[in-house]
Every structure is written in structure tokens, then in C-alpha cells.
């Protein structure tokens, strides 16, 4: 039995990763920062480890005896108090955890798996069927969250030599969906208050990955991936943005009468810059409701290719689109 240390275990995707690992014979130690998380993690069969992503001593103790580390925890634009907080939790914490794991004299970790985002290649234009070899755009073109992931990826891959004792593997995920998604519940609330708009009509296409498929692919990657491998994981076929969100909203009981409002893209772009300026001038807490990242996701094609994972890892879908919708 191999021991896995997991960050972000009490989050939406983290819970699916725990289920996938435990059902396949792994013992999971999951980072926890509260008694509430302790209870959730314990109920799922994981062993909670009280510490913080910024506690070097605590993390050093947490990974002792672990063969694999999966770093899934991340701060999103929607739940960050500031850009500085987002960068601290996503960049600084990643570098700290990686450096602790990479200490050959004290660490038993042989695989470091970083859960990243397709957004690291988001350049503001339509992107269709992008592979893992697609180059990063200039860093200033990326939104805050995607920039934090791109910086972390580049640090990990540049630091880790091909001859290193520890394998570093990067998983790039598109929009992750499935049951138990609190973000979907929040969006449903916006719909019911007539606050949901289709930017540009919502006719763009995107890649998605169900949390069950993502967690399965992550397990395959830690078992079969090589050092410095990057893998895209998707549900296969891309889906139109408007159809995907409408299907989910309807499953949650949202009336189609509340899903007809359209916001022209030029107006949405103006709002992004106006909001950013207001937040900066008045030093408002949190990040703007509409950001550059959100605008691009909502209005541009963004599809990625996961042939590498399917060919090298034997990755396939454990659940299809209709089955996933039926579970909502």
C-alpha cells in the first residue's frame, strides 16, 4: 500500500481524488486546517493532517512516510481577498511544498503531482484542440489565477531535472464538473435572481472534465507518468458553453425563462476594465465579480486535446456527459 499526501482534499475535486485513491488501495493523508475539514476527511476514509500550506515544519512532518504528493489546493479568483493572497497561496505555497518534497535527505516522496489548469495557455484568442506542447503566452496576457498556475508550472518543470530522484507530473484540467459542486449552487442562485448573462451569446465551445474522470486520470498519471510529463484530461468531446450551463441549470430546477439575457462582448470587456479600476482605486476586498479570465472563458472557444493521456496512460472516461448530468 502506497501513502499519498493530498492538499485540497476537502474541496470539490479533492473529495473525488480521495475516493479514487482509497478504492484502489492507497492510504491517503490529507491536509486539513479546521475541525470541520477533519470530520469530512475522516468520514471519507482519509487521515487528516493539521497544518498549513505555509507551515514549513508542519508540511515536513506531514509528508513523512509518504510516497506520493498530490497538490490540489488552490485559491481561486472567486474566493480570494486580494491578488497578493492568491499569489501567496498558489505560487509561494507550491514552491514551499515542492522544495520540502525534493529534499533527498529527509523526504521519501517519489512523485510530486501538481494539479494545474488549461488556463496557463489562455492568450485571449480562440484556442481549439490545444496539446500539451502549446507554448505559454506572455505572462502579462494571463489573468491572476492562470498566471499563478503558469508561474508554478514553470518553476516546477525548470527546477526538476530529468535525472531527479522525484518525478514531477503536471495535470492540466479544463472546467471540472459533477455533483457536490458548490460553485454550481452559487451560479444557480445568480440565475434565480436574474443575474446570469450569456456573454456574446454563449456560443463558444469549451472542454470539460467530470470530477470522476479527472480523479481517475490523476491516479493513472501518478502510476504511469514520467518525470516532467504534462497531461491534459477531458471528457473527450467539447461542448457549447451555453448548452453545458443550461443543461446543468435545468437539472437544478432553474426555469429557462431566467436564461435568456445576453451581454454583448464589448460591453462585458468594458465592465472588466471598469471593475478592475474601481477595485484598485477604492482598495476593495476580494476580486471583481467579472475578471479577464472569466470573460475569456465565457466568450472564446477553449478546447484542449487529451490524446497523450489516452495513449500513454490508458485514460478513458469513467462517466459520460449524460450520466454526469443525471447525477446532478
UniProtKB/Swiss-Prot annotation:
It holds the Pfam family 3Beta_HSD. One of its GO terms (molecular function) is dTDP-glucose 4,6-dehydratase activity. Its main location: endoplasmic reticulum. The active site is at 145 (proton acceptor). It is a single-pass membrane protein. Its EC number is 1.1.1.170. It is found in: Endoplasmic reticulum membrane; Lipid droplet. One of its GO terms (biological process) is cholesterol biosynthetic process. The keyword Transmembrane applies. Keywords: Cholesterol biosynthesis, Cholesterol metabolism, Endoplasmic reticulum, Lipid biosynthesis, Lipid droplet, Lipid metabolism, Membrane, NAD, Oxidoreductase, Steroid biosynthesis, Steroid metabolism, Sterol biosynthesis, Sterol metabolism, Transmembrane, Transmembrane helix. NAD(+) binds at residue 149. InterPro entries: 3Beta_OHSteriod_DH/Estase, NAD(P)-bd_dom_sf, NAD(P)-dependent_oxidoreduct. Belongs to the 3-beta-HSD family. Catalyzes the NAD(P)(+)-dependent oxidative decarboxylation of the C4 methyl groups of 4-alpha-carboxysterols in post-squalene cholesterol biosynthesis. Homodimer. This is Sterol-4-alpha-carboxylate 3-dehydrogenase, decarboxylating.
Amino acid at each position: 500500500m502506497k501513502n499519498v499526501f493530498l492538499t485540497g482534499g476537502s474541496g470539490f475535486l479533492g473529495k473525488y481524488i480521495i475516493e479514487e485513491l482509497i478504492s484502489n488501495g492507497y492510504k491517503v493523508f490529507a491536509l486539513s486546517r479546521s475541525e470541520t475539514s477533519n470530520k469530512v476527511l475522516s468520514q471519507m476514509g482519509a487521515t487528516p493532517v493539521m497544518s498549513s500550506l505555509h507551515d514549513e515544519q508542519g508540511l515536513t512532518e506531514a509528508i513523512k512516510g509518504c510516497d506520493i504528493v498530490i497538490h490540489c489546493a488552490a485559491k481561486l479568483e472567486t474566493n480570494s481577498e486580494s491578488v497578493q493572497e492568491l499569489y501567496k497561496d498558489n505560487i509561494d505555497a507550491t514552491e514551499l511544498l515542492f522544495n520540502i518534497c525534493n529534499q533527498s535527505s529527509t523526504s521519501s516522496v517519489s512523485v510530486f503531482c501538481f494539479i494545474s489548469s488549461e488556463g496557463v495557455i489562455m492568450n485571449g484568442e480562440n484556442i481549439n484542440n490545444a496539446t500539451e506542447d502549446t507554448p505559454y503566452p506572455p505572462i502579462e496576457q494571463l489573468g491572476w489565477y492562470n498566471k499563478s498556475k503558469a508561474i508554478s508550472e514553470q518553476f516546477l518543470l525548470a527546477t526538476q531535472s530529468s535525472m531527479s530522484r522525484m518525478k514531477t507530473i503536471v495535470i492540466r484540467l479544463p472546467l471540472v464538473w459533477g455533483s457536490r459542486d458548490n460553485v454550481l449552487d452559487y451560479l444557480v442562485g445568480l440565475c434565480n435572481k436574474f443575474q446570469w448573462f450569456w456573454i456574446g451569446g454563449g456560443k463558444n465551445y469549451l472542454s470539460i472534465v467530470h470530477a470522476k474522470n479527472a480523479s481517475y486520470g490523476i491516479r493513472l498519471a501518478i502510476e504511469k507518468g514520467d518525470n516532467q510529463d504534462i497531461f491534459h484530461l477531458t471528457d473527450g468531446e467539447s461542448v457549447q458553453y451555453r448548452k453545458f450551463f443550461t443543461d446543468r441549470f435545468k437539472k437544478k430546477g432553474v426555469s429557462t425563462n431566467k436564461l435568456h439575457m445576453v451581454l454583448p462582448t464589448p460591453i462585458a470587456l468594458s465592465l472588466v476594465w471598469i471593475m478592475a479600476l474601481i477595485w484598485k482605486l477604492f482598495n476593495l476586498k476580494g476580486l471583481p465579480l467579472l475578471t479577464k479570465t472569466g470573460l475569456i472563458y465565457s466568450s472564446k472557444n477553449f478546447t484542449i486535446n487529451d490524446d497523450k493521456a489516452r495513449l500513454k496512460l490508458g485514460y478513458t472516461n469513467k462517466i459520460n456527459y449524460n450520466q454526469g448530468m443525471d447525477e446532478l
